[in-house]
Amino acid sequence: METKNDLISKTRLISQKIASTEFKTPSEIVRWMGAMQAQDYAMAKWAIGVRLTNLNEKIIDSAIDKGEILRIHVLRPTWHFVSADDIYWMLQLSAPKVKSSLKSRHNQLELTESVIAKTSSIIEKTLSDQICLTRDELRNEFHKAGIRTDENRLSHILFRSELDGIICSGPIKENKLTYALLQERVPHKKELSRDESLAELAKRYFNSRCPATLEDFIWWSNLTIKDARTAFNLIKSEFYQETRGSIKYLIPNSFSEPTLKNAAVNLLPAYDEFLISYRDRSSSLSEVNNKRTVSDNGIFYPTIVVNGQVAGLWKRIFQKNKVIVSIDFFQPPGKTTLIKIAKKVSAFGRFLGKETEFTLKTD
């Protein structure tokens, strides 16, 4: 018999486009999701890959090189992939609160507004005329100007410059990530009013992650409770509330209950939105397995998801042109599940353009 948690988790596989997708390009899926957590760069690319059919990593690299999708600090104090079409309104909406949360740390690092003004000026002059530089190359420019970059100051200087809308991710250069000037990389789009931005963010979230609660949205968006409720009220005519247990979930009016094949198996990356999008993850992750899946300091490990439930962990080991995927189930899997895992491992290899094999960890 299907439980409440089973239905919620299976519905999320559908809404997040993991079970199936109509989208064809990286920018389409990133736009659908609104923002996708991306501090683990390689895994974040796989998060896009699992939501598109027959995609390879080079296509995502191309989208990044062209500036169709950006990797930038937005919403919360961490990197996200965002569609270039959304970057300006999303930064305008979320940057002030993130900057406010960093004041104490910036005081500790002696990153005063005067220092930030100097670093911003250096960045703008150095990167003007479509110049793209790596983190280390920008570090050298700061050193020339006598600005310290130790004690994690460099990370926070660049972080602040992203929040100020000065820089964003540039094209990949010699297998290294670069920074570019945002206004040169992405022509300025039409600005949205604050209410329009709140409504748009809420629509993206609840369409792509339903069923979800207001508390889930507050966690993901990092909005204040007041702003989140305003957003909720602005879009409520397009959604309906459904109570499951004692919890109220928001679901689009146009959404229909999913039909998912038995033993649907997915190989999801670290920090995937399937888990990290929600404050309450209990519908897909039991309390016992949560301790193995999420570390005490907030690291989300790559997961094996069977029928919407986290059933194990996996990791990758690179050997020249081959990648070995180590599989660790929480409980012994059936033969059908193992066959499907083998297919998912092969799909991961095709995504990377490498041969694959997988090993099954046994106690």
Residue ranges and their predicted role:
Residues 234-289:
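Non-catalytic regulatory appendages
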Residues 65-74, 78, 162-172, 236-243, ...:
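A short, conserved structural fragment
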Residues 287, 293-299, 304-363:
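Glycine-rich, small/acidic residue-mixed loop/short-helix segments
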Residues 198-253:
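Active-site-proximal binding-pocket segments
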Residues 54-62, 148-160, 225-232:
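Short amphipathic alpha-helical interaction segments
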Residues 114-131, 194-210, 232:
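Positively charged, polyanion-binding regions of nucleic-acid-associated proteins
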Residues 1-150, 324:
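Phosphate-backbone binding and catalysis cores of DNA-processing enzymes
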Residues 81-87, 173-192, 249-259:
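Short, cationic-aromatic polyanion-contact patches
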